A protein has these predicted regions:
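A generic secondary-structure signal
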Residues: 27-31, 93-97, 130
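Catalytic cysteine-centered active loop of the rhodanese-like fold, especially the PTP/DSP P-loop
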Residues: 100, 110-115, 119
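Glycine-rich loops and low-complexity Gly/Arg-rich segments
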Residues: 64-68, 92-95, 133-137
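A short, acidic, amphipathic alpha-helical segment used as a generic capping/interface helix at domain edges
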Residues: 87-102
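C-terminal domain-boundary segment and adjacent tail
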Residues: 116-142
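Metal-dependent polysaccharide deacetylase catalytic core of the NodB/CE4 family, i.e.
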Residues: 1-85, 102-111
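Aromatic/hydrophobic pocket-lining residues that form the small-molecule binding cavity
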Residues: 17, 21, 90, 120, ...
Length: 142
């Protein structure tokens, strides 16, 4: 899902979140067709970044949306001094970040698709290979 603003003072207001969810759904329907429906929501910065989300979580659920967070990352938004500079480094960054988490039976990788993230696109086939070699399966979120 997309978002247009971060929540002021890291306090999320459910009305703003629901409006954002509706705007996002409408934008996606314009591109993908009126039949499009997502069942997933990712808070900007992740669920762990905000306070007072219980009401918003409930309202999102009423809209048929479940929130999800990432539990590992490829490092493409990290400070330049620690950001991977090649494909192998990108895969290693994911492996290291995944090893920090206690729950690794499901991996949700944070990656960005901005114009400046060429390495992310270049590394994607190797990232997929890495997860397949580790026995992960790929599926569709709806």
């Amino acid at each position: 899902m997309i978002f247009s603003t971060l929540y002021p003072n890291r306090i999320a207001k459910s009305e703003a979140i629901i409006n954002e969810a509706k705007k996002t759904e409408n934008a996606l329907k314009q591109v993908l067709g009126e039949d499009f429906k997502s069942g997933c929501w990712r808070y900007p910065g992740g669920h762990m970044s905000w306070k007072n989300l219980a009401d918003a979580d409930k309202k999102l659920e009423e809209m048929g949306l479940s929130w999800l967070d990432w539990n590992c990352l490829n490092g493409d938004a990290e400070p330049k001094k620690v950001r991977p500079v090649d494909v192998a480094g990108n895969v290693k960054f994911i492996e290291n970040s995944l090893n920090i988490n206690k729950v690794t039976d499901v991996a949700v990788v944070l990656m960005h698709d901005a114009e400046s993230k060429e390495l992310t696109a270049e590394a994607l086939p190797k990232i997929i290979d890495y997860f397949k070699e580790k026995g992960y399966k790929f599926g569709v979120l709806d």
